[in-house]
Amino acid sequence: MSFAEKLTGLMARPNQQDPAGGPEQPWYLKYGSRVLGIVAAFFAILFGLWNVLSIIGLSVSCLVAGIIQMLAGFVVMALEAPCCFICIEKVGSVADMMDTKPLYFRAGLYCAMAVPPIFMCFGLASLFGSGLIFATGAVYGMMALGKKASAAEMRAAAQQASYGGNAAPTTNDRAGIVNNAQPFSFTGAVGTDSNV
């Protein structure tokens, strides 16, 4: 396999069918989630390096948070864009294995990797770098939920599940929430009214 064939094979990932049998996603969600993941990984690595440099201020927790954030950035970059690690053979097979998993697995992994650096060293660098990875996980989670039904399907489901069973919908002006409700009576004031 030539270098060009390998590169085009790695770049064609978002067009492939979902091998896990999940719902079909629109093209902008497939490519958008990949691009968001790549951008998130880049900024996580960059701001993780910034947190690692905080060892100058003797902040060990920020050092560890920066290392974890950089590792999370490398993992996200390897899973979203394995073409960036083309010299490492196992990255492609790991990315292929991850593509066979359901989308909620990837969403959970990204969200779980993004949380520890934020709690260990709360600051703009860890919040922005890990927050983008968390946002990528949230997008994958929403993709895992799938698209909602059409308006006609939701309307039909609401009519079937309405209270009262198979009652046909009424178009009467006086139709209320409660069936067989009597109108209010305007007979006058109550006898015990003091008229104050």
Curated annotation (Swiss-Prot):
Top-rank lineage group of the source organism: Eukaryota
Residues that span the membrane, as ranges: 36-56, 67-89, 114-134
Pfam families: Cg6151-P
Membrane topology listed for this record: Multi-pass membrane protein
Molecular function GO labels: calcium channel activity; identical protein binding
Keywords: Calcium, Calcium channel, Calcium transport, Cell membrane, Cell projection, Cytoplasmic vesicle, Endocytosis, Endosome, Ion channel, Ion transport, Membrane, Synapse, Transmembrane, Transmembrane helix, Transport
Annotated control of activity: Channel activity is inhibited by La(3+), which reduces Ca(2+) influx and thus inhibits it's function in promoting activity-dependent bulk endocytosis (ADBE) in response to high stimuli.
Major location category of this protein: membrane
One Gene Ontology CC term in the entry: synaptic vesicle membrane
Site (Calcium ion selectivity): 80
Example GO BP: photoreceptor cell differentiation
Subcellular location as annotated: Cell membrane; Cytoplasmic vesicle, Secretory vesicle, Synaptic vesicle membrane; Presynaptic cell membrane; Endosome
Disulfide bonding pattern of the chain: none
Function of the molecule: Transmembrane protein which mediates synaptic endocytosis, fitness-based cell culling, neuronal culling, morphogen gradient scaling, and calcium transport. Regulates synaptic endocytosis and hence couples exo- with endocytosis. Controls two major modes of synaptic vesicle (SV) endocytosis in the synaptic boutons of neuromuscular junctions (NMJs); Ca(2+) channel-independent Clathrin-mediated endocytosis (CME) in response to mild stimulation, and Ca(2+) channel-dependent activity-dependent bulk endocytosis (ADBE) in response to strong stimulation.
Subunit structure: Homomultimer. Associates with the dally/ magu complex.
Family, as annotated: Belongs to the calcium channel flower family.
Entries under PANTHER family matching the protein: CALCIUM CHANNEL FLOWER HOMOLOG
Name this polypeptide is given: Calcium channel flower
Native source species: Drosophila virilis (Fruit fly)
Gene behind this protein: flower
